Amino acid sequence: MCSSDLKVVALTHQSNVLGTIPPISKINQLAKSNGALFILDACQSAPHFSIDVQELDVDAIAFSGHKMFGPTGIGVLWAKRELLEKIEPFIFGGSMIDDVSMTNATWAELPRKFEAGVPNMAQAVGLAAAIDYIDAIGLNNIDRKSTRLNSSH
């Protein structure tokens, strides 16, 4: 893992099989000490407990909507502002462009820079409703119940 070619370390936050959580902080430190970005896949953890991206000091974190009881085809990506400002969009169109000419284009301000074309409005409303549902139950209650179920085996 200490190769000079290392650019990104992407890791699951929580196993979907055993529910285990790897030593995120240690792996993150190792990645950053080698100049790599650290990206966390929170698909399993996001619907089970609260995640503090500042405490984890990740460069980016993502999770899918369907793991949050929401619709398929949508998810969430959070990334540090400096990373989002540095990277280029990979899909183009719509209101993501601030100004365009025959020889140049400038991107809209974040987050619109990455919002090409027509947004998935139905999926976004569905995901928001799913997150509201989880919030109503309470992540602490979900975590407590999961812990109790896991300890009974």
Please name every model-derived segment.
Residues 1-2, 149-153:
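Positively charged, low-complexity/disordered segments
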Residues 4-148:
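Pyridoxal 5′-phosphate
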